[in-house]
A protein has these predicted regions:
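Acidic active-site catalytic centers that drive phospho-/nucleotidyl reactions
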Residues: 28, 66, 122
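PAS-family sensory domains
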Residues: 41-117
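Sensory beta-sandwich core in regulatory modules of signaling proteins
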Residues: 24, 116-120
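PAS-family sensory domain signal
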Residues: 2-59, 99-108
Length: 122
């Protein structure tokens, strides 16, 4: 049975992301440029619109011991030791620390184009 609602789902993605607290970002390691959904920033305790080059690899709002694990995961991806990593980190927000689950994976089709897909879930 074919549904004939005639609606596009893409316009609803920001609202779905916000309600489900799922964030997504795409980051080019070679240029330091990227884009992220507002919820990705919020989950990371960051101000929406901050250049990703000021967040990725720095993670100033991540608890120091978790930050080191996250940097190690990023390094493993950069050096081709893995194409995906996931884990949980504590992120500082206005009320203290919250747990955020992260998934980091290669998004580029070519190894010469180091593009990462960064997802997080609050």
């Amino acid at each position: 049975m074919k549904t004939t609602l005639g609606i596009e789902f893409e316009p609803f993605f920001p609202q779905i992301s916000h309600r489900a607290k799922i964030g997504c970002a795409k980051y080019d390691l070679s240029t330091g440029e990227g884009v992220a959904m507002e919820q990705w920033y919020l989950n990371m305790g960051e101000v929406p619109g901050t250049p990703l080059s000021q967040i990725v690899g720095i993670y100033s709002n991540v608890k120091p011991e978790d930050r080191e694990c996250l940097k190690t995961s990023l390094s493993r991806l950069v050096h081709g030791e893995t194409d995906h990593d996931q884990g949980e980190v504590r992120v500082k927000d206005g009320e203290g620390w919250k747990w955020v689950r992260l998934d980091i994976m290669e998004a580029g089709l070519e190894k010469s184009s180091p593009i990462l897909l960064l997802m997080n879930y609050d």
